[in-house]
Amino acid sequence: MENFWQACSAQLEQELTPQQYSAWIKPLTPLDYEDGTLRIAAPNRFKLDWVKTQFASRITSIAAQFWEVPVEVQFVLDPRLVAARRPAAQASVVSDRADDVPSNVLEPIPSNATDHTPRRDQSRINTALTFDSFVTGKANQLARAAAIQVANNPGSSYNPLFLYGGVGLGKTHLIHAIGNQVLADNPNVKIRYIHAEQYVRDVVTAYQRKGFDDFKRYYHSLDLLLIDDIQFFGGKSRTQEEFFYAFEALIAAKKQIIITSDTYPKEITGMDDRLISRFDSGLTVAVEPPELEMRVAILLKKAVQEGVTFSDDVAFFVAKHLRSNVRELEGALRKILAYSRFHGKDITIEVVKDALKDLLSVQNRQISVENIQKTVADFFNIKVADMYSKKRPANIARPRQIAMYLAKELTQKSLPEIGELFGGRDHTTVLHAVRKIAADRGKSPECNHELHVLEQTLKG
């Protein structure tokens, strides 16, 4: 039995991500194998249900290969834990497990990420935000790999590097991590981290003081420029012009530029086409919301930092219902702790439901692209299948464009993701639809009314 489990675990460790293996396979315990039946114990109901649906077939296949006979795999709750369900025992078990959570499962909230003190002689890099402290999972592994490559070869790999995604997903952490590594490798490099709003203010100040020569001299002399939330440049033509000059100067000198945004470059409203084409000349990488395993690890580790312990059941309950970003998880944890302490109650699923009832009700109403497609199809009396088809008559094409527009406005999906959900269409098709419907809405009261009705229907 021991030999089988070692072989099975080794195989699964190769096939899964470290987060998946640590969260789902490592906690399992093989109980016995008799008459072609293999019994495996899970530490709680959440892990039991998830492993049965996600990994049962693979474990069954490995077992059949090992014993060379058909094998039935049964998953059960760990008998030892079932027999010892006292709260004190639970706290001890969770505390022990929390120590096994990797130390990099939390994304610290930078204390100076939006500090706008005008001190240009400092890099403004947050030393707490490093690659070691970064949360790693499937959602951000490509962005992290690109960031490490840039940190190791600034100015020669992926220039510019453009990271985009929703708030609280780790973009700011990654660009600070790059800055920290570059500084560690060469303390003499000239680095500047700046939020886009502060850059705009610097442009305004230079204009008021007639100091554009000093402004250009400073920004053009940097070795590494880190611009956060560049979508704030939208509609600000003078700021974009100055940034274009800085961009050209730095790229020509083989200096590194790293940019973050909450949206895909071509989706940034009011951005000069020249800049968008420059952004596209480097590497553009999406940072996605964290997957379930990462969210659980974040909650457990953060709870330990707060001096409390979560049962696995509670952590999985919260992680399954809150899916958007790390900051949302941290905010939810603070609400749970405050509610628990105020009412003098232990943290249970029922307490979590009470503490987060407003947040959970919003999550339960979360809008999906599939729901948008069905609602729009019903509204215009067409088939849902028409949303994915290649048909192009006006009575189908326009509802499809409206559905794409609503998907962009009401969900966190990127343009490529929306295109994939509309029959594998290219992201440029989605972008055209979004811009067209947005323009029509501004000009046509009838279009605006239709969209308003659809939005209210979807939001309930």
From Swiss-Prot:
Signal peptide: none annotated. It comes from Herminiimonas arsenicoxydans. The keyword Hydrolase does not apply. Residues 1-78 are annotated as: Domain I, interacts with DnaA modulators. Plays an essential role in the initiation and regulation of chromosomal replication. ATP-DnaA binds to the origin of replication (oriC) to initiate formation of the DNA replication initiation complex once per cell cycle. Binds the DnaA box (a 9 base pair repeat at the origin) and separates the double-stranded (ds)DNA. Forms a right-handed helical filament on oriC DNA; dsDNA binds to the exterior of the filament while single-stranded (ss)DNA is stabiized in the filament's interior. Its main location: cytoplasm. Keywords: ATP-binding, Cytoplasm, DNA replication, DNA-binding, Lipid-binding, Nucleotide-binding. Residues 78-123 are annotated as: Domain II. The lineage of its organism: Bacteria, Pseudomonadati, Pseudomonadota, Betaproteobacteria, Burkholderiales. The keyword Membrane does not apply. This is Chromosomal replication initiator protein DnaA. NCBIfam families: DnaA. CDD domains: AAA (cd00009), Bac_DnaA_C (cd06571).
